[in-house]
Amino acid sequence: MAKLIIPSDYDPKMTIRETEKAIRYIRETFQTEFGTAMNLERISAPMFVKKSSGLNDNLSGWEKPVSFTLHDGNEGELQIVHSLAKWKRWALKHYGFSHGEGLFTNMNAIRKDEEVLDNLHSVYVDQWDWEKVIDKSERTEATLRQTVQRIFETIKGMEYHVRALYPQAAYHLPEEISFVTSEELEARWPSLTPSEREDKICQEKGAVFLEHIGGALPLSKKPHDLRAPDYDDWTLNGDLLFWYEPLQRAFEVSSMGIRVDEDRLQEQLKLAGAEDRLDLPFHQALLKGDLPYSIGGGIGQSRLCMLLLGKAHIGEVQASIWPDEIVEKCQAAKIQLL
């Protein structure tokens, strides 16, 4: 399904070549400042993993990854990654990262089953996937919120950099971020859909970290949004959202969380009806205590560029494939798809 929001009287303010230069600047500058602020080291990341490893991100549970086999077939089915959520935790262990240290990667993924292709969603996903070692005693809301605050401040700092170089295009971000839970949103707006609740709270607050994604809510008995049961702890995770004036909607830049421990892994797999995953190598390692406790997430590279440059469509900051109807409408509205 394809949906498109056309801002009235849209003016891109930058040529395609100017946009490309700005994209490069944002990507290079942000990853340096983000890595420094979070004590993260950049490492290489796989484009595909073995299906049998259990390392791929199952997302909501129904999306099928792009898969293939090698010529001799000896390695079994290989899958293009959806994200590196579980692989990163494995890498923390095998690359020798210690408490307080972490990694980030330049992650590229294909999500062929993306339900809606719109201003924010593409089948091509590029993000800074990151993971950091913590102690079990740090598996707390305080740790989560401190980390969110640090990421928000790094993004806010990027706004000042972009405004200095591209004052005609830079989008103004709020000065502060608010914290709210999905349960609080449901209680306040029970008749609205989860996405409508996000729009409401973001328009009110400007920037929000929405906590508790994945578990069933008290009133609806349904989760605010689906989340894989074997990486985030659903009680210690969330999405970083901004109110985005050009599209008049909430704008997600990052999803992150404190990762499951041995107990939460088993609890969430049972709730999801996915206990068969416990036999996979990744899950066995976690149950045996062979993997570190960690916090991690992903920050959308194209999303961040789009936000900071005030673009109307993610296709203005990444090269992807779009339905002909969207391409034609974008051309008519001066939206310059790459």
UniProtKB/Swiss-Prot annotation:
UniProt keyword annotations, A-Z: Amino-acid biosynthesis, Asparagine biosynthesis, ATP-binding, Cytoplasm, Ligase, Nucleotide-binding
Keyword S-adenosyl-L-methionine in annotation: no
Family matches, as HAMAP family: AsnA
Annotated compartments: Cytoplasm
Protein name in the entry: Aspartate--ammonia ligase
Classification via SUPFAM superfamilies: Class II aaRS and biotin synthetases (SSF55681)
Family of this protein: Belongs to the class-II aminoacyl-tRNA synthetase family. AsnA subfamily.
EC identifiers of the protein: 6.3.1.1
GO MF annotation list: aspartate-ammonia ligase activity; ATP binding; catalytic activity, acting on a protein; transferase activity
GO CC annotation terms, alphabetical: cytosol
Reaction(s) catalysed (UniProt annotation): L-aspartate + NH4(+) + ATP = L-asparagine + AMP + diphosphate + H(+)
Keyword set includes Isomerase: no
Pathways per UniProt: Amino-acid biosynthesis; L-asparagine biosynthesis; L-asparagine from L-aspartate (ammonia route): step 1/1
GO biological process, one term: L-asparagine biosynthetic process
A UniProt-annotated Pfam family: AsnA
Major subcellular location class: cytoplasm
NCBIfam families: asnA
